[in-house]
Protein backbone atom coordinates (compact mmCIF):
# COMPACT_ATOMS: atom_id res chain seq x y z
CA UNK A 1 0.00 0.00 0.00
CA UNK A 2 1.23 3.50 -0.77
CA UNK A 3 1.02 6.53 1.52
CA UNK A 4 -2.26 7.73 0.03
CA UNK A 5 -4.02 4.45 0.75
CA UNK A 6 -2.67 4.33 4.29
CA UNK A 7 -3.81 7.90 4.83
CA UNK A 8 -7.32 7.13 3.55
CA UNK A 9 -7.54 4.04 5.74
CA UNK A 10 -6.58 6.04 8.82
CA UNK A 11 -9.11 8.75 7.86
CA UNK A 12 -11.76 6.04 7.82
CA UNK A 13 -10.97 5.48 11.49
CA UNK A 14 -11.64 9.15 12.23
CA UNK A 15 -14.95 9.01 10.35
CA UNK A 16 -16.07 5.89 12.23
CA UNK A 17 -15.18 7.40 15.61
CA UNK A 18 -17.08 10.58 14.74
CA UNK A 19 -20.09 8.57 13.58
CA UNK A 20 -20.14 6.55 16.80
CA UNK A 21 -20.23 9.74 18.89
CA UNK A 22 -22.87 11.49 16.75
CA UNK A 23 -25.27 12.04 19.68
CA UNK A 24 -24.08 8.58 20.79
CA UNK A 25 -26.76 6.98 18.61
CA UNK A 26 -24.33 4.76 16.70
CA UNK A 27 -22.19 3.63 19.63
CA UNK A 28 -21.80 0.01 18.35
CA UNK A 29 -19.60 1.44 15.58
CA UNK A 30 -16.97 1.90 18.31
CA UNK A 31 -16.45 -1.87 18.25
CA UNK A 32 -14.73 -1.54 14.84
CA UNK A 33 -13.69 2.14 14.76
CA UNK A 34 -10.04 1.51 15.67
CA UNK A 35 -9.56 -1.30 13.16
CA UNK A 36 -8.28 1.10 10.44
CA UNK A 37 -5.59 2.40 12.82
CA UNK A 38 -4.51 -1.16 13.63
CA UNK A 39 -4.33 -1.99 9.91
CA UNK A 40 -2.07 1.01 9.27
CA UNK A 41 0.13 0.18 12.26
CA UNK A 42 0.43 -3.46 11.16
CA UNK A 43 1.43 -2.48 7.62
CA UNK A 44 4.02 0.02 8.84
CA UNK A 45 5.45 -2.54 11.28
CA UNK A 46 5.68 -5.27 8.63
CA UNK A 47 7.53 -2.96 6.27
CA UNK A 48 10.01 -1.42 8.67
CA UNK A 49 13.70 -1.76 7.81
CA UNK A 50 15.52 -4.29 9.96
CA UNK A 51 17.66 -1.55 11.52
CA UNK A 52 14.62 0.55 12.47
CA UNK A 53 12.37 -1.18 15.03
CA UNK A 54 9.77 1.65 15.27
CA UNK A 55 8.48 4.52 13.15
CA UNK A 56 7.24 8.01 14.00
CA UNK A 57 5.04 7.94 10.90
CA UNK A 58 2.31 6.21 12.87
CA UNK A 59 1.82 9.37 14.95
CA UNK A 60 1.28 11.37 11.77
CA UNK A 61 -1.23 8.88 10.38
CA UNK A 62 -3.17 9.01 13.66
CA UNK A 63 -3.23 12.76 14.27
CA UNK A 64 -5.62 14.05 11.59
CA UNK A 65 -8.27 11.31 12.04
CA UNK A 66 -8.20 11.78 15.82
CA UNK A 67 -8.42 15.55 15.33
CA UNK A 68 -11.53 15.05 13.19
CA UNK A 69 -13.08 12.91 15.92
CA UNK A 70 -12.23 15.37 18.70
CA UNK A 71 -13.42 18.39 16.75
CA UNK A 72 -16.74 16.92 15.63
CA UNK A 73 -17.59 15.70 19.13
CA UNK A 74 -16.33 18.47 21.44
CA UNK A 75 -16.40 21.68 19.36
CA UNK A 76 -19.23 22.98 21.57
CA UNK A 77 -16.90 23.36 24.59
CA UNK A 78 -15.64 26.56 22.95
CA UNK A 79 -19.00 28.19 23.73
CA UNK A 80 -18.08 28.17 27.43
CA UNK A 81 -14.48 29.38 27.11
CA UNK A 82 -12.41 30.61 24.13
CA UNK A 83 -9.48 28.54 25.40
CA UNK A 84 -11.38 25.40 24.42
CA UNK A 85 -10.71 26.16 20.75
CA UNK A 86 -7.36 24.48 21.30
CA UNK A 87 -8.89 21.44 23.01
CA UNK A 88 -9.37 19.21 19.93
CA UNK A 89 -5.81 19.88 18.76
CA UNK A 90 -4.30 19.09 22.15
CA UNK A 91 -6.52 16.05 22.65
CA UNK A 92 -5.65 14.66 19.22
CA UNK A 93 -1.94 15.14 19.89
CA UNK A 94 -2.17 13.37 23.26
CA UNK A 95 -4.14 10.46 21.79
CA UNK A 96 -1.66 10.16 18.93
CA UNK A 97 1.19 10.01 21.43
CA UNK A 98 -0.69 7.23 23.23
CA UNK A 99 -1.02 5.30 19.96
CA UNK A 100 2.67 5.88 19.22
CA UNK A 101 3.67 4.66 22.69
CA UNK A 102 1.59 1.51 22.21
CA UNK A 103 3.29 0.93 18.84
CA UNK A 104 6.67 1.40 20.53
CA UNK A 105 5.94 -1.23 23.21
CA UNK A 106 4.39 -3.63 20.72
CA UNK A 107 7.53 -3.52 18.59
CA UNK A 108 9.69 -4.07 21.68
CA UNK A 109 7.81 -6.98 23.24
CA UNK A 110 5.64 -8.57 20.55
CA UNK A 111 6.73 -7.75 17.00
CA UNK A 112 4.37 -9.47 14.55
CA UNK A 113 2.53 -11.21 17.40
CA UNK A 114 -1.28 -11.25 17.47
CA UNK A 115 -1.44 -10.44 21.17
CA UNK A 116 0.78 -7.37 20.75
CA UNK A 117 -2.20 -5.10 20.11
CA UNK A 118 -3.16 -5.40 23.77
CA UNK A 119 -0.72 -2.53 24.33
CA UNK A 120 -3.18 -0.20 22.58
CA UNK A 121 -5.87 -1.09 25.13
CA UNK A 122 -3.38 -0.79 27.98
CA UNK A 123 -2.10 2.65 27.01
CA UNK A 124 -5.54 4.02 26.15
CA UNK A 125 -6.82 2.96 29.57
CA UNK A 126 -3.82 4.61 31.21
CA UNK A 127 -4.51 7.78 29.21
CA UNK A 128 -8.14 7.82 30.34
CA UNK A 129 -7.04 7.38 33.95
CA UNK A 130 -4.72 10.37 33.54
CA UNK A 131 -7.62 12.37 32.12
CA UNK A 132 -9.58 11.80 35.31
CA UNK A 133 -6.84 12.95 37.67
CA UNK A 134 -4.57 15.61 36.19
CA UNK A 135 -5.20 19.36 36.07
CA UNK A 136 -6.71 19.30 32.56
CA UNK A 137 -9.23 16.62 33.48
CA UNK A 138 -11.42 15.92 30.46
CA UNK A 139 -12.82 12.36 30.61
CA UNK A 140 -15.64 13.21 28.18
CA UNK A 141 -14.30 11.04 25.36
CA UNK A 142 -13.35 8.08 27.51
CA UNK A 143 -14.37 5.27 25.21
CA UNK A 144 -16.66 3.51 27.68
CA UNK A 145 -18.87 6.63 27.76
CA UNK A 146 -19.92 5.99 24.17
CA UNK A 147 -22.47 3.35 25.24
CA UNK A 148 -24.33 5.71 27.58
CA UNK A 149 -27.42 5.63 25.35
CA UNK A 150 -27.34 1.83 25.29
CA UNK A 151 -27.60 0.98 29.01
CA UNK A 152 -29.08 -2.42 28.19
CA UNK A 153 -25.71 -3.44 26.67
CA UNK A 154 -23.43 -2.36 29.53
CA UNK A 155 -25.14 -3.54 32.72
CA UNK A 156 -21.81 -5.06 33.76
CA UNK A 157 -20.48 -1.54 34.42
CA UNK A 158 -21.64 -2.24 38.00
CA UNK A 159 -18.50 -4.42 38.17
CA UNK A 160 -16.06 -2.58 35.90
CA UNK A 161 -17.15 1.03 35.53
CA UNK A 162 -16.52 2.88 32.28
CA UNK A 163 -13.00 1.41 32.13
CA UNK A 164 -14.54 -1.99 31.43
CA UNK A 165 -16.30 -0.47 28.44
CA UNK A 166 -13.03 0.93 27.09
CA UNK A 167 -11.36 -2.46 27.51
CA UNK A 168 -14.27 -4.22 25.78
CA UNK A 169 -14.16 -1.79 22.85
CA UNK A 170 -10.46 -2.43 22.34
CA UNK A 171 -10.83 -6.21 22.63
CA UNK A 172 -13.58 -6.13 19.99
CA UNK A 173 -11.44 -3.99 17.69
CA UNK A 174 -8.50 -6.35 18.15
CA UNK A 175 -10.63 -9.42 17.37
CA UNK A 176 -12.20 -7.82 14.29
CA UNK A 177 -8.76 -6.62 13.17
CA UNK A 178 -7.38 -10.17 13.26
CA UNK A 179 -10.32 -11.26 11.11
CA UNK A 180 -9.65 -8.42 8.64
CA UNK A 181 -5.98 -9.43 8.49
CA UNK A 182 -7.04 -12.80 7.07
CA UNK A 183 -8.19 -10.94 3.95
CA UNK A 184 -5.65 -8.08 3.79
CA UNK A 185 -2.17 -9.38 4.56
CA UNK A 186 -0.69 -12.14 2.39
CA UNK A 187 0.91 -13.98 5.30
CA UNK A 188 -2.49 -14.33 7.00
CA UNK A 189 -4.30 -15.16 3.75
CA UNK A 190 -2.19 -18.29 3.35
CA UNK A 191 -3.38 -19.72 6.69
CA UNK A 192 -6.62 -20.95 5.12
CA UNK A 193 -10.33 -21.10 5.87
CA UNK A 194 -10.00 -22.82 9.23
CA UNK A 195 -7.91 -19.95 10.55
CA UNK A 196 -10.44 -17.41 9.24
CA UNK A 197 -13.33 -19.28 10.83
CA UNK A 198 -11.52 -19.34 14.16
CA UNK A 199 -11.07 -15.57 14.09
CA UNK A 200 -14.67 -15.09 12.98
CA UNK A 201 -15.87 -17.14 15.95
CA UNK A 202 -13.59 -15.23 18.32
CA UNK A 203 -14.74 -11.82 17.07
CA UNK A 204 -18.38 -12.88 17.33
CA UNK A 205 -17.89 -14.14 20.88
CA UNK A 206 -16.04 -11.03 22.07
CA UNK A 207 -18.85 -8.82 20.76
CA UNK A 208 -21.90 -10.90 21.69
CA UNK A 209 -21.03 -12.57 25.01
CA UNK A 210 -20.81 -9.31 27.04
CA UNK A 211 -23.97 -8.04 25.31
CA UNK A 212 -25.82 -11.24 26.17
CA UNK A 213 -24.73 -11.14 29.81
CA UNK A 214 -25.84 -7.51 29.99
CA UNK A 215 -29.25 -8.18 28.45
CA UNK A 216 -29.87 -11.02 30.92
CA UNK A 217 -29.01 -8.65 33.78
CA UNK A 218 -31.22 -5.95 32.22
CA UNK A 219 -34.31 -8.16 32.18
CA UNK A 220 -33.72 -9.85 35.55
CA UNK A 221 -32.56 -6.87 37.65
CA UNK A 222 -34.85 -6.01 40.56
CA UNK A 223 -34.69 -2.97 42.81
CA UNK A 224 -34.68 -3.33 46.58
CA UNK A 225 -38.17 -3.05 48.04
CA UNK A 226 -37.60 0.02 50.22
CA UNK A 227 -39.91 2.90 51.07
CA UNK A 228 -40.12 5.32 48.14
CA UNK A 229 -39.66 9.09 48.23
CA UNK A 230 -41.34 11.67 46.03
CA UNK A 231 -38.97 13.95 44.13
CA UNK A 232 -39.90 17.09 42.20
CA UNK A 233 -37.32 18.38 39.71
CA UNK A 234 -37.39 21.99 38.51
CA UNK A 235 -35.98 23.25 35.18
CA UNK A 236 -36.26 27.08 35.32
CA UNK A 237 -34.68 27.60 31.87
CA UNK A 238 -32.70 30.75 32.56
CA UNK A 239 -30.34 31.85 29.80
CA UNK A 240 -26.88 31.56 31.42
CA UNK A 241 -25.56 34.28 29.13
CA UNK A 242 -28.23 36.81 30.18
CA UNK A 243 -31.29 35.89 32.28
CA UNK A 244 -29.57 34.04 35.11
CA UNK A 245 -27.34 36.95 36.00
CA UNK A 246 -29.51 39.84 34.78
CA UNK A 247 -32.53 38.74 36.80
CA UNK A 248 -32.56 39.62 40.47
CA UNK A 249 -32.16 36.69 42.92
CA UNK A 250 -35.80 37.23 43.93
CA UNK A 251 -36.99 36.92 40.31
CA UNK A 252 -35.07 33.65 39.92
CA UNK A 253 -36.63 32.28 43.11
CA UNK A 254 -40.08 33.35 41.93
CA UNK A 255 -39.66 31.29 38.77
CA UNK A 256 -38.46 28.26 40.74
CA UNK A 257 -41.41 28.53 43.14
CA UNK A 258 -43.90 29.02 40.32
CA UNK A 259 -42.73 25.81 38.65
CA UNK A 260 -42.33 23.73 41.81
CA UNK A 261 -45.83 24.62 42.99
CA UNK A 262 -47.28 22.89 39.90
CA UNK A 263 -46.12 19.45 41.11
CA UNK A 264 -45.33 19.68 44.82
CA UNK A 265 -47.85 18.38 47.35
CA UNK A 266 -48.05 17.14 50.92
CA UNK A 267 -46.20 13.93 49.98
CA UNK A 268 -43.22 15.65 48.34
CA UNK A 269 -39.89 14.76 49.98
CA UNK A 270 -37.43 16.68 47.80
CA UNK A 271 -37.57 19.65 45.45
CA UNK A 272 -34.39 19.65 43.36
CA UNK A 273 -33.24 22.86 41.64
CA UNK A 274 -30.29 23.24 39.24
CA UNK A 275 -26.70 24.37 39.59
CA UNK A 276 -26.08 28.09 40.25
CA UNK A 277 -29.79 28.60 40.79
CA UNK A 278 -29.28 31.01 43.71
CA UNK A 279 -27.16 34.06 42.99
CA UNK A 280 -26.82 35.88 46.33
CA UNK A 281 -23.07 35.16 46.65
CA UNK A 282 -23.72 34.63 50.36
CA UNK A 283 -20.91 34.20 52.86
CA UNK A 284 -20.93 30.56 53.95
CA UNK A 285 -20.37 31.36 57.63
CA UNK A 286 -23.61 33.37 57.49
CA UNK A 287 -25.50 31.38 54.89
CA UNK A 288 -28.87 31.73 56.58
CA UNK A 289 -28.72 35.50 55.98
CA UNK A 290 -29.17 34.87 52.26
CA UNK A 291 -32.50 36.39 51.13
CA UNK A 292 -32.90 33.61 48.54
CA UNK A 293 -32.53 30.86 51.15
CA UNK A 294 -34.97 32.59 53.50
CA UNK A 295 -37.48 33.08 50.69
CA UNK A 296 -37.27 29.44 49.55
CA UNK A 297 -37.54 28.26 53.16
CA UNK A 298 -40.89 30.04 53.44
CA UNK A 299 -42.06 28.14 50.37
CA UNK A 300 -40.55 24.87 51.62
CA UNK A 301 -42.47 25.09 54.89
CA UNK A 302 -45.77 25.10 53.02
CA UNK A 303 -45.19 21.37 52.47
CA UNK A 304 -44.81 19.17 55.56
CA UNK A 305 -42.04 16.86 54.27
CA UNK A 306 -40.29 18.84 51.55
CA UNK A 307 -36.58 19.69 51.50
CA UNK A 308 -35.23 21.98 48.81
CA UNK A 309 -31.82 21.23 47.30
CA UNK A 310 -30.39 23.91 45.01
CA UNK A 311 -27.15 25.08 43.46
CA UNK A 312 -25.68 28.35 44.66
CA UNK A 313 -22.71 30.66 44.15
CA UNK A 314 -21.09 31.45 47.51
CA UNK A 315 -18.01 32.85 49.21
CA UNK A 316 -15.98 31.08 51.89
CA UNK A 317 -13.91 33.16 54.33
CA UNK A 318 -10.49 31.65 55.06
CA UNK A 319 -8.72 31.85 58.44
CA UNK A 320 -6.45 34.87 58.86
CA UNK A 321 -3.24 34.46 56.84
CA UNK A 322 -4.33 31.20 55.16
CA UNK A 323 -3.98 31.26 51.38
CA UNK A 324 -5.12 28.40 49.13
CA UNK A 325 -4.84 27.90 45.36
CA UNK A 326 -8.33 29.36 45.01
CA UNK A 327 -7.78 32.24 47.46
CA UNK A 328 -8.65 35.83 46.57
CA UNK A 329 -7.51 38.73 48.71
CA UNK A 330 -9.54 41.60 50.10
CA UNK A 331 -8.68 44.97 48.61
CA UNK A 332 -8.30 46.58 52.05
CA UNK A 333 -6.49 43.68 53.78
CA UNK A 334 -3.83 41.70 51.87
CA UNK A 335 -3.62 39.13 54.70
CA UNK A 336 -7.29 38.14 54.60
CA UNK A 337 -8.49 35.78 51.87
CA UNK A 338 -11.69 34.17 50.68
CA UNK A 339 -12.72 31.63 48.05
CA UNK A 340 -15.53 31.82 45.51
CA UNK A 341 -17.39 28.52 45.42
CA UNK A 342 -19.99 26.59 43.47
CA UNK A 343 -22.07 24.78 46.07
CA UNK A 344 -25.13 22.62 46.58
CA UNK A 345 -27.23 23.57 49.58
CA UNK A 346 -29.96 21.62 51.38
CA UNK A 347 -32.20 24.27 52.91
CA UNK A 348 -33.07 23.57 56.54
CA UNK A 349 -36.79 23.75 57.35
CA UNK A 350 -36.19 25.21 60.82
CA UNK A 351 -37.08 28.92 60.78
CA UNK A 352 -35.75 29.66 64.30
CA UNK A 353 -32.21 28.21 64.27
CA UNK A 354 -31.70 26.96 60.70
CA UNK A 355 -28.60 24.93 59.87
CA UNK A 356 -28.60 24.35 56.14
CA UNK A 357 -26.17 21.74 54.78
CA UNK A 358 -23.82 22.52 51.93
CA UNK A 359 -21.09 20.91 49.87
CA UNK A 360 -18.63 22.41 47.40
CA UNK A 361 -18.21 21.33 43.82
CA UNK A 362 -14.89 19.49 43.76
CA UNK A 363 -14.45 18.12 40.23
CA UNK A 364 -13.92 21.50 38.59
CA UNK A 365 -14.09 22.32 34.90
CA UNK A 366 -10.61 23.18 33.54
CA UNK A 367 -10.14 26.77 32.32
CA UNK A 368 -13.65 27.63 33.55
CA UNK A 369 -13.69 26.85 37.27
CA UNK A 370 -10.00 26.25 37.76
CA UNK A 371 -6.84 27.35 36.00
CA UNK A 372 -4.73 24.24 35.30
CA UNK A 373 -1.04 24.52 36.15
CA UNK A 374 -1.80 27.96 37.57
CA UNK A 375 1.84 28.89 38.13
CA UNK A 376 2.49 28.50 34.40
CA UNK A 377 -0.85 29.32 32.76
CA UNK A 378 -2.19 31.89 35.20
CA UNK A 379 -1.88 34.64 32.58
CA UNK A 380 -4.73 32.98 30.63
CA UNK A 381 -7.23 33.71 33.40
CA UNK A 382 -8.86 36.56 31.48
CA UNK A 383 -9.98 34.12 28.79
CA UNK A 384 -11.92 31.94 31.23
CA UNK A 385 -15.68 32.12 31.27
CA UNK A 386 -17.14 34.50 33.84
CA UNK A 387 -19.74 32.40 35.64
CA UNK A 388 -21.66 35.41 36.89
CA UNK A 389 -18.87 36.49 39.20
CA UNK A 390 -17.18 33.17 39.97
CA UNK A 391 -14.48 33.40 37.33
CA UNK A 392 -11.16 31.77 38.15
CA UNK A 393 -10.23 28.85 40.38
CA UNK A 394 -13.01 27.94 42.82
CA UNK A 395 -12.86 26.51 46.32
CA UNK A 396 -13.63 22.81 46.72
CA UNK A 397 -14.07 20.00 49.26
CA UNK A 398 -11.25 17.52 50.00
CA UNK A 399 -13.72 14.60 49.82
CA UNK A 400 -17.31 13.74 48.91
CA UNK A 401 -19.94 15.08 51.34
CA UNK A 402 -23.31 13.33 51.72
CA UNK A 403 -26.51 15.11 52.79
CA UNK A 404 -28.36 13.44 55.65
CA UNK A 405 -31.70 14.02 57.41
CA UNK A 406 -33.22 12.23 60.38
CA UNK A 407 -36.26 10.87 58.57
CA UNK A 408 -34.94 10.66 55.00
CA UNK A 409 -32.39 8.58 53.07
CA UNK A 410 -28.87 9.92 52.62
CA UNK A 411 -28.43 11.72 49.32
CA UNK A 412 -25.52 12.51 47.01
CA UNK A 413 -25.69 15.81 45.13
CA UNK A 414 -23.32 15.87 42.15
CA UNK A 415 -22.76 19.28 40.61
CA UNK A 416 -22.49 19.36 36.80
CA UNK A 417 -19.01 18.19 35.71
CA UNK A 418 -18.72 15.89 38.73
CA UNK A 419 -21.18 13.51 37.06
CA UNK A 420 -18.54 12.62 34.44
CA UNK A 421 -16.38 10.88 37.09
CA UNK A 422 -17.75 7.46 38.03
CA UNK A 423 -15.36 6.80 40.90
CA UNK A 424 -16.09 10.18 42.49
CA UNK A 425 -19.84 9.51 42.41
CA UNK A 426 -19.09 6.09 43.87
CA UNK A 427 -17.45 7.77 46.87
CA UNK A 428 -20.80 9.34 47.82
CA UNK A 429 -22.48 5.94 47.62
CA UNK A 430 -19.72 4.29 49.66
CA UNK A 431 -20.50 6.87 52.37
CA UNK A 432 -24.12 5.78 52.48
CA UNK A 433 -25.91 7.75 49.75
CA UNK A 434 -29.08 5.93 48.69
CA UNK A 435 -30.21 8.48 46.10
CA UNK A 436 -28.25 10.61 43.64
CA UNK A 437 -29.25 14.09 42.53
CA UNK A 438 -27.39 15.70 39.63
CA UNK A 439 -27.73 19.47 39.36
CA UNK A 440 -26.29 21.14 36.29
CA UNK A 441 -26.40 24.16 34.01
CA UNK A 442 -25.94 22.85 30.48
CA UNK A 443 -27.10 26.03 28.77
CA UNK A 444 -23.48 27.19 28.41
CA UNK A 445 -23.09 24.79 25.47
CA UNK A 446 -26.25 25.96 23.69
CA UNK A 447 -28.27 23.50 21.61
CA UNK A 448 -25.38 21.17 20.70
CA UNK A 449 -24.67 17.48 21.34
CA UNK A 450 -22.91 18.56 24.55
CA UNK A 451 -25.97 18.75 26.78
CA UNK A 452 -27.41 15.53 25.33
CA UNK A 453 -24.17 13.62 25.92
CA UNK A 454 -23.95 14.98 29.45
CA UNK A 455 -27.48 13.81 30.23
CA UNK A 456 -26.74 10.37 28.78
CA UNK A 457 -23.76 9.92 31.12
CA UNK A 458 -26.21 9.87 34.05
CA UNK A 459 -27.32 6.41 32.90
CA UNK A 460 -23.79 5.10 33.43
CA UNK A 461 -23.60 6.57 36.93
CA UNK A 462 -26.89 4.82 37.77
CA UNK A 463 -25.59 1.45 36.54
CA UNK A 464 -22.22 1.77 38.29
CA UNK A 465 -23.83 2.56 41.64
CA UNK A 466 -27.29 0.95 41.19
CA UNK A 467 -28.85 4.13 42.54
CA UNK A 468 -31.88 6.03 41.21
CA UNK A 469 -31.02 9.50 39.94
CA UNK A 470 -32.97 12.74 39.67
CA UNK A 471 -31.33 15.19 37.26
CA UNK A 472 -32.13 18.91 37.35
CA UNK A 473 -30.76 21.04 34.52
CA UNK A 474 -31.20 24.80 34.40
CA UNK A 475 -31.76 24.12 30.76
CA UNK A 476 -30.79 21.02 28.88
CA UNK A 477 -32.33 17.69 29.84
CA UNK A 478 -33.88 17.12 33.25
CA UNK A 479 -34.98 13.55 33.90
CA UNK A 480 -35.15 10.59 36.23
CA UNK A 481 -32.88 7.56 35.85
CA UNK A 482 -33.60 4.09 37.21
CA UNK A 483 -30.82 1.95 38.77
CA UNK A 484 -30.74 0.12 35.41
CA UNK A 485 -29.84 3.36 33.63
CA UNK A 486 -33.25 3.76 32.01
CA UNK A 487 -34.24 7.43 31.65
CA UNK A 488 -37.79 8.76 31.95
CA UNK A 489 -39.66 12.09 32.09
CA UNK A 490 -37.02 13.73 29.88
CA UNK A 491 -37.61 17.43 29.39
CA UNK A 492 -37.03 19.37 26.18
CA UNK A 493 -34.15 21.79 25.69
CA UNK A 494 -34.77 25.51 26.26
CA UNK A 495 -38.15 25.09 27.95
CA UNK A 496 -39.37 25.73 31.46
CA UNK A 497 -40.43 22.43 33.00
CA UNK A 498 -41.16 20.58 36.22
CA UNK A 499 -41.33 16.80 36.63
CA UNK A 500 -42.19 14.47 39.50
CA UNK A 501 -41.56 10.82 40.26
CA UNK A 502 -41.40 8.30 43.11
CA UNK A 503 -37.85 6.99 43.60
CA UNK A 504 -36.91 3.94 45.65
CA UNK A 505 -33.67 4.42 47.64
CA UNK A 506 -31.14 1.59 47.29
CA UNK A 507 -28.62 0.45 49.91
CA UNK A 508 -26.52 -2.38 48.41
CA UNK A 509 -22.99 -1.50 47.26
CA UNK A 510 -21.84 -2.65 43.84
CA UNK A 511 -18.44 -4.20 43.19
CA UNK A 512 -17.44 -1.02 41.36
CA UNK A 513 -18.41 1.23 44.28
CA UNK A 514 -16.38 -0.93 46.67
CA UNK A 515 -13.26 -1.11 44.48
CA UNK A 516 -13.42 1.98 42.25
CA UNK A 517 -11.36 2.33 39.06
CA UNK A 518 -9.23 -0.77 39.64
CA UNK A 519 -8.97 -1.42 35.88
CA UNK A 520 -7.65 2.10 35.30
CA UNK A 521 -5.17 1.87 38.18
CA UNK A 522 -3.78 -1.48 37.04
CA UNK A 523 -3.53 -0.28 33.43
CA UNK A 524 -1.67 2.87 34.41
CA UNK A 525 0.82 0.86 36.46
CA UNK A 526 1.52 -1.68 33.69
CA UNK A 527 1.61 0.96 30.96
CA UNK A 528 4.34 2.88 32.77
CA UNK A 529 6.22 -0.33 33.56
CA UNK A 530 6.16 -1.63 29.99
CA UNK A 531 7.08 1.75 28.53
CA UNK A 532 10.13 2.01 30.78
CA UNK A 533 11.12 -1.58 29.99
CA UNK A 534 10.76 -0.83 26.28
CA UNK A 535 13.09 2.11 26.66
CA UNK A 536 15.66 -0.07 28.45
CA UNK A 537 15.34 -2.84 25.82
CA UNK A 538 15.84 -0.28 23.05
CA UNK A 539 19.04 1.00 24.66
CA UNK A 540 20.36 -2.54 25.20
CA UNK A 541 19.69 -3.48 21.57
CA UNK A 542 21.56 -0.41 20.36
CA UNK A 543 24.47 -1.27 22.65
CA UNK A 544 24.57 -4.86 21.33
CA UNK A 545 24.60 -3.64 17.73
CA UNK A 546 27.51 -1.34 18.46
CA UNK A 547 29.46 -4.23 20.01
CA UNK A 548 29.15 -6.51 16.99
CA UNK A 549 30.02 -3.84 14.41
CA UNK A 550 33.46 -4.49 12.83
CA UNK A 551 36.22 -2.08 13.82
What role is predicted for each listed range?
Residues 1-218, 446-447, 473, 488, ...:
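Membrane-embedded alpha-helical bundles of multi-pass enzymes
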Residues 2-5, 205-266, 429, 441-454, ...:
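Non-cytosolic juxtamembrane linkers/loops
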Residues 18-21, 100, 233, 344-346, ...:
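Conserved hydrophobic/aromatic beta-strand scaffold that supports enzyme active sites
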Residues 21-38, 69-71, 235-236, 268-284, ...:
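Short, conserved active-site loops that position catalytic residues or coordinate cofactors/metal ions
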Residues 77-80, 130-162, 329-422:
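Active-site catalytic loop in hydrolytic enzyme cores
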Residues 95, 121-122, 270, 276-278, ...:
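CN hydrolase (nitrilase-like) catalytic-core segments centered on the catalytic cysteine
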Residues 151, 226, 303, 332, ...:
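A generic fold-level signal
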Residues 215-367, 402-407, 413, 417, ...:
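Soluble catalytic regions of membrane-associated enzymes that act on cell-envelope
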Amino acid sequence: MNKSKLFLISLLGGVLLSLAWLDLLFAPVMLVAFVPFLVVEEYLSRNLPEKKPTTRKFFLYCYLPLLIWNFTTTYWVAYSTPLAIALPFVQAALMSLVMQAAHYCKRSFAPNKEWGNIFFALFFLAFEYLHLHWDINFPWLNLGNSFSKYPCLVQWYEYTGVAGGTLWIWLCNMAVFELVCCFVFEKKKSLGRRHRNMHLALATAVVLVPCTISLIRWFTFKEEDNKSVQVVVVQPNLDPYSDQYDFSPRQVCDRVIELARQKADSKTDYIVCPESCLQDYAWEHNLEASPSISYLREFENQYPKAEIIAGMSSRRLLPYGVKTKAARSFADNPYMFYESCNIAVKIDRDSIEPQSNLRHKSVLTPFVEKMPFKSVLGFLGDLALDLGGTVGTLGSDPEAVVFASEDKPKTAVAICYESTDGQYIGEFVAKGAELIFIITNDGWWKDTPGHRQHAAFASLRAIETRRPIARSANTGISCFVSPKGEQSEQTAYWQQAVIKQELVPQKALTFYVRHGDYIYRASAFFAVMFFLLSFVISKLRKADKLKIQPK
